[in-house]
Amino acid sequence: MLDGLKMEENFQSAIETSASFSSLLGRAVSPKSVCEGCQRVISDRFLLRLNDSFWHEQCVQCASCKEPLETTCFYRDKKLYCKYHYEKLFAVKCGGCFEAIAPNEFVMRAQKSVYHLSCFCCCVCERQLQKGDEFVLKEGQLLCKGDYEKERELLSLVSPAASDSGKSDDEESLCKSAHGAGKGASEDGKDHKRPKRPRTILTTQQRRAFKASFEVSSKPCRKVRETLAAETGLSVRVVQVWFQNQRAKMKKLARRQQQQQQDQQNTQRLTSAQTNGSGNAGMEGIMNPYTTLPTPQQLLAIEQSVYNSDPFRQGLTPPQMPGDHMHPYGAEPLFHDLDSDDTSLSNLGDCFLATSEAGPLQSRVGNPIDHLYSMQNSYFTS
C-alpha cells in the first residue's frame, strides 16, 4: 500500500517537473493551433511563434533559398526570408544597374528613381554627373546637357519618311543620325562647317541581334546596350540611335493603322448615308409629278384676279332686257331667259363646260360674264 502511494506521488512530481520544463522551453501545443506556413494543424509538442502566428519548426525557412532560419528572419506577405534574399527582392534598386542599394550607401535621386553614385552618369559619354550639373531624364536614361542638345539636333535632321522608303532592309537599318546630318548639310549650302558623318550599314547578323533584343524590350538598359555593342562591334551610340529610330517607326506604323481604320469607318458611314438618301430621293421623284399641279383654289384665285366677275359694282348701268325688272342684278333669271331662245343662242351650251367634268380648269376656258356680254351684243345687233 505504501509502495503504491509512493509510486503515485513520484508520477505526479514527474508530471509537474515536465510541465515546468515545457513552460521554460516553449508553449504546450493546443490541438487548435494551425501552422501559418503549411496551414496544417500543429501536432508537435513544441512550436515557434512569429508575429502572433504559430509555425512548425521545419516550416521556418526562407521562401527563396529554403534554408532554415535559426536566429533572425524577415516577414513579408505571410512569407519568411533570410536577410540576403529579402534585400535582393524588396530593397530599393538602382535605376542604372538595377541592383539593390544597401541601406548604408550614398545615393543620387532623379524624380522617382534612385541611383548609385557610380551609376549616376550620362548614358552617352558616361561622364559621372556631380551635384549641380544639368541633366535630362529621358525614358529612364540620364543625359547630360551637351549630349541632349546634340541628340535633339540630330533627331531634328532625320527625315520622317526615311523608314518608309522602298529601300532594302540593310539601308533601312542605317544609323539615321549620320544620314540625317549629311542630308541636312547638303540641303543647306550656307552651313559649310558641319561635317558629314559616315554612314553605318548593318549586316544581317547585327540586324537580327537588334531585332531580337527589341522584341524583348524596346527600351533596353545601359548594360544591354553595351552588351549588344560588344557583340556587334558597333558603338553604344549607334545602338542607342537604332533603338530610338525603331521605336519611332513602330509608333508611326501604329498611327497609320489607326488612321486607316478611321478612314474605313468613315467610308462605311458615307456609303450607308448615300444609300438612305437615294431611297428617299426615289420616293420624292415619284411624288413630285403630283405635287407640282396647283390646287383648284389657286386656279380660281388667279382667274378671279384677271377677270372682274362683278362689273356692275364699277358704276355701269345694268343692261335692260325683257324681264330684267324682276331680277336686275341676278344671273339665274338671265340664263333662263337666254336659254329659252333657240334661234340665236343655240350654241350656248357648247361654250360652257360642266363643273363636274371640267374641274379646276373651268376658269381657264372663259368667264361666264364675258360670254354673257358677247351674246347680249349679238342679240341686240341682229
Curated annotation (Swiss-Prot):
Gene Ontology BP terms: axon guidance; central nervous system development; central nervous system neuron differentiation; cerebellum development; dentate gyrus development; dopaminergic neuron differentiation; hippocampus development; locomotory behavior
Subcellular localization, as worded in the UniProt entry: Nucleus
Span of domain LIM zinc-binding: 33-92, 92-154
Keywords, comma-separated and alphabetical: Activator, Developmental protein, DNA-binding, Homeobox, LIM domain, Metal-binding, Nucleus, Repeat, Transcription, Transcription regulation, Zinc
Residue ranges of the annotated DNA-binding region, renumbered to this chain: 195-254
Alphabetized GO MF terms: DNA-binding transcription activator activity, RNA polymerase II-specific; metal ion binding; RNA polymerase II transcription regulatory region sequence-specific DNA binding
Pfam families in UniProt: Homeodomain (PF00046), LIM (PF00412)
Domain of life: Eukaryota
Classification via SMART domains: HOX, LIM
Region listing for Disordered, in residue ranges: 161-208, 252-286
Full protein name: LIM homeobox transcription factor 1-alpha
Species: Mus musculus (Mouse)
The gene coding this protein: Lmx1a
